[in-house]
From Swiss-Prot:
GO terms for biological process: hydrogen peroxide catabolic process. It comes from Pan paniscus (Pygmy chimpanzee). GO terms for molecular function: haptoglobin binding; heme binding; hemoglobin alpha binding; metal ion binding; organic acid binding; oxygen binding; oxygen carrier activity; peroxidase activity. InterPro entries: Globin, Globin-like_sf, Globin/Proto, Hemoglobin_b, Hemoglobin_oxygen_transport. This is Hemoglobin subunit gamma-1. Gamma chains make up the fetal hemoglobin F, in combination with alpha chains. The lineage of its organism: Eukaryota, Metazoa, Chordata, Craniata, Vertebrata.
Length: 147
């Protein structure tokens, strides 16, 4: 799963306190759908996903992106039990939605990119390392039902 040092936890929590969940969530999910278009098949009910501008302006993409990052915020409070924290979401995405678990890894990487854009110089290599460790652990926790 990945062991988080106290420094990792402090770094993740500190930056998370400055994240605008609505903006970053919409941008993260939107970028995932644009950069990895095959992920769009899980979002048929979202309406127009025909172009980058349609995706980035789609209110359903923004709303679901906010929901995803809100869930991530809950996980940040439970870094030592990500598998337990995401047990129900893992089951939902595996058994009911049949989401390819690789998509969780891709979404995490896109989130790291979005945070780097939003926080610029504040998003140091050390901050990136802690966040990368976290999104990798979250992807693993969300994929746990698949194994």
């Amino acid at each position: 799963m990945g062991h988080f040092t106290e420094e990792d936890k402090a770094t993740i929590t500190s930056l998370w306190g400055k994240v605008n969940v609505e903006d970053a969530g919409g941008e993260t999910l939107g970028r995932l759908l644009v950069v990895y278009p095959w992920t769009q098949r899980f979002f048929d009910s979202f309406g127009n996903l025909s172009s980058a501008s349609a995706i980035m302006g789609n209110p359903k993409v923004k709303a679901h992106g906010k929901k995803v990052l809100t869930s991530l915020g809950d996980a940040i409070k439970h870094l030592d039990d990500l598998k337990g924290t995401f047990a129900q979401l893992s089951e939902l995405h595996c058994d009911k939605l049949h989401v390819d678990p690789e998509n969780f890894r891709l979404l995490g990487n896109v989130l790291v990119t979005v945070l780097a854009i939003h926080f610029g110089k504040e998003f140091t290599p050390e901050v990136q390392a802690s966040w990368q460790k976290m999104v990798t652990a979250v992807a693993s926790a969300l994929s746990s039902r698949y194994h």
